[in-house]
A protein has these predicted regions:
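Extended, low-polarity transmembrane helix blocks
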Residues: 1-29, 40-55, 61-136
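Interfacial loop at the N-terminal end of multi-pass membrane proteins
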Residues: 33-39
Length: 136
């Protein structure tokens, strides 16, 4: 059953690793979108958040201080949900629905990241297929 924990980590972090890479590959477009929705300091925020989710995703995936990695992901997705996907501000019904789905996706990812954080903290040294134990 050890493989189940590894597969769960792979599936969970795919979105963070691919999005983290996109923060750099599509930096200008992401900065423009962040500015359009009113995110603070998109010129700094996009690359920093890209680094945050790329590193956090790799930490969870590899099991290198997975608790810290999961915490980084958690600290990313909640503000992003509130700032980037504020569906309650949308007047167009289709845009409101799209942003609500994205908001709820991020809230769900926050729950998953929090669960991984707890798992790494509580059982870190006993977890299979990890490189290090927890940092916290």
């Amino acid at each position: 059953m050890d493989i189940v924990f590894l597969v769960a980590r792979i599936l969970f972090v795919l979105i963070f690793i691919s999005s983290g890479l996109a923060h750099f590959a599509q930096r200008k477009a992401m900065q423009e979108y962040a500015a359009a929705v009113g995110a603070p300091a998109p010129g700094l925020g996009v690359p920093l958040s890209g680094l945050m989710i790329l590193v956090g995703g790799l930490m969870v995936l590899l099991g290198i201080w997975g608790d810290l990695g999961a915490l980084l992901l958690f600290l990313f997705v909640l503000p992003v949900a509130l700032i980037m996907h504020a569906f309650w501000k949308q007047e167009d019904p289709q845009m409101r629905q799209t942003e609500q789905v994205m908001f709820l996706k991020n809230v769900s990812l926050a729950g998953g990241a929090l669960a991984f954080f707890w798992l790494f903290v509580e059982y870190g040294d006993e977890l299979p297929l990890t490189i290090t134990g927890p940092l916290f």
